Amino acid sequence: MLKDLNTNQGLKPWRVESVFYCIVIVLIFIGAFKIAEAVFKPLAISIVLGFLVYPVYTFLARFKVPKFLIVFIIFFLLFSFSYLIFSFVYYSVTVLMKQLPYYQNQLAFIMKDVLSRYKVDSSVINDVNFSGYIYPFLTRAYNEIIGFTSSLVVVFLLLYFLLSEIHVFEMKLDKAFKKPISTRFIGALDTINNQIGKYLGIKILVSCLTGILVFIGLTLFGQDFPLVWAVLSFVFNFIPSIGSILAVFFIVITSLIQFYPNLNIVLYVFIYNTSIQMLIGNILEPKMQGKRLDISPFLLLCFLFFWGWLWGIVGLLISYPFTVIVKVIVDNVSWLKSFSVFLGGSEILSNISHISSKDKEI
């Protein structure tokens, strides 16, 4: 074993040190992101918004629209969207608070009915204060969304300066680095921009379609708050892997509380919403997205949990864009190629096997 390590084929000391330093740097960054959350979270959101609005910026720039007018149009759209979100949150919380006593009584009735079927004393349910659990949850969610809305001023300020310098960024790279390095930088940024811009654009379209279908279906079934669940389905669709599962789960749970003991409608609601998520998420969206960056689904889920732990709901929403950024960076740094292989999905393995088969033929 020691002999192998001393040969040229063994681990080189500088390579081990590089890996160690990388791990230390990553841990320092994680600590900084967690401690200085109030600073880094608006910065991260502004970067993701920058990728989202950049196609609009380039589209209007083709028609020789003045840059100040492009920025004005983009910010008008963003402010309008933010106002709609704030109005929706206020409406949703108000409606939920009004209906909360009904749902509390209905939930108590369901639990008593289930316990009585198993001949268990249900008198203990009378002492349970469900509102004591639900009100803090709604208040916490409301405060988090209001806090996010209030931080939009900082986000928009950062985005403004980002857009004002975006047209000279390539020239800065050419001046700062030599030609091969600057070209590689620009290529990596183009890849990140294309991947994230295309992902977010198509995600908005399919999420809107999902929300519309959810609203129509729940209205026909007679479920309460169809608009609330439609908008939440739209938002949850941006959370990779588990977002659609969470959307269906919350819709079905509230449907069960509302329609119990009529379980047929609950079953119809479950089948309808599951079918929408499967058809759009597994058939329509992959066809629209086409060829995407090859990322391991398992590691994508790990990144999802990591960003969710780090920054909550905002972390869940930005997990995929930042995973793409990490993947493109490790793809373009030679001594990080090993990490790129582990971050890749099944496509990279087929490429490796294809190359090895060609080598055998040669």
Curated annotation (Swiss-Prot):
Signal peptide: none
Record's bilayer topology term: Multi-pass membrane protein
Keyword Chaperone: no
Chief location: membrane
Annotated compartments: Cell membrane
Keyword vocabulary terms for this entry: Cell membrane, Membrane, Transmembrane, Transmembrane helix, Transport
Pfam families found in the cross-reference section: AI-2E_transport
InterPro entries attached to this UniProt entry: AI-2E-like
GO terms under cellular component: plasma membrane
Membrane-spanning ranges: 20-40, 43-63, 68-88, 144-164, 212-232, 234-254, 265-285, 304-326
GO BP, sorted A to Z: transmembrane transport
Family that this chain belongs to: Belongs to the autoinducer-2 exporter (AI-2E) (TC 2.A.86) family.
Record-given protein name: Putative transport protein BB_0006
Organism encoding this protein: Borreliella burgdorferi (strain ATCC 35210 / DSM 4680 / CIP 102532 / B31)
